[in-house]
Regions:
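Non-catalytic macromolecular-recognition regions in eukaryotic signaling proteins
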Residues: 18, 27, 65, 85-86, ...
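Eukaryotic beta-sheet cores, primarily in C2 and C2-like/PH beta-sandwich modules
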Residues: 58, 69-75, 82-84
Length: 134
């Protein structure tokens, strides 16, 4: 557990996975991407938002805690290779929801696809969706 957290607070936070998740991928032009067309190495932007239990929201905002709990990324379809995985550094909060926007470099050399967008919280998969390459 991160320093500054009592065991009780840490346990409460671990059990309070975000709910009502929305995960969207946007292409470099800012359009919603349902599939990925890779012509060159390109930056896509992954938007992840969800609802956080009000009792843990101040702890949830701690970067040290999120760094150990939240994983957002893109996996290859066999699940073996995680192309990209990260804890975002910037969160926006409003009305009990968080939003983070994460730049994702997708390289044309990795164009096999399909990939899976995924969000996990304390090792538990909360969300995944296939995204195809063309």
């Amino acid at each position: 557990k991160p320093s500054g957290f009592s065991q009780e607070r840490w346990d409460a936070l671990k059990m309070s996975a975000p709910s009502d998740l929305e995960v969207e991928l946007f292409d470099p032009a800012g359009n919603l991407a349902t599939e990925i067309a890779i012509n060159s190495d390109e930056y896509f932007v992954l938007h992840v938002s969800g609802k956080v239990d009000p009792s843990v929201i101040s702890d949830f905002k701690s970067y040290a805690a999120l760094n150990q709990l939240l994983r957002i990324g893109i996996k290859s379809n066999d699940g073996q290779q995680t192309m990209w995985q990260s804890t975002p550094e910037k969160f926006e909060f409003s009305n009990g929801r968080f939003l983070c926007k994460i730049p994702v470099m997708i390289s044309k050399s990795s164009k096999s696809g399909p990939y899976r967008l995924h969000v996990a919280y304390y090792f538990k998969e909360l969300f995944q969706r296939e995204i195809f390459c063309r």
